[in-house]
């Protein structure tokens, strides 16, 4: 079948490489664009990466606590309204509410010292 031949050729040339796709997606979502591991897994799968490769790639991503700290969390030291807005933003990126609260509290404590 011609379609299978074309797909196989693309795989051999590295154009259809799930590991590369994961790396490319992860690169786009680093630093200020950081997302939770759970969110990243969903992105990988939505982009057509196989479940097996996507789950294996998760070990290469920073844990959620580290990735939250990569974000601009200056608002964590702000007033209640700013902190609430930041918490909603982080929740929208797939971070667990308990992790968000704990991390923001740590940042606030560090700022006081």
For every predicted segment, state its role.
Residues 1-113:
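An alpha-helical, amphipathic repeat domain used for nucleic-acid recognition
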């Amino acid at each position: 079948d011609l379609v299978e031949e074309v797909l196989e050729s693309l795989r051999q040339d590295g154009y259809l490489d799930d590991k590369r796709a994961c790396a490319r997606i992860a690169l786009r979502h680093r630093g200020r664009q950081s997302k939770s591991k759970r969110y990243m897994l969903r992105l990988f799968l939505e982009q057509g990466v196989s479940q097996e490769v996507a789950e294996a790639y998760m070990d290469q991503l920073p844990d959620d606590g580290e990735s939250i700290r990569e974000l601009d969390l200056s608002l964590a030291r702000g007033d209640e309204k700013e902190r609430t807005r930041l918490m909603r933003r982080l929740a929208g990126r797939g971070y667990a509410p308990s992790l968000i609260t704990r991390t923001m509290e740590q940042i606030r404590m560090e700022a006081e010292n």
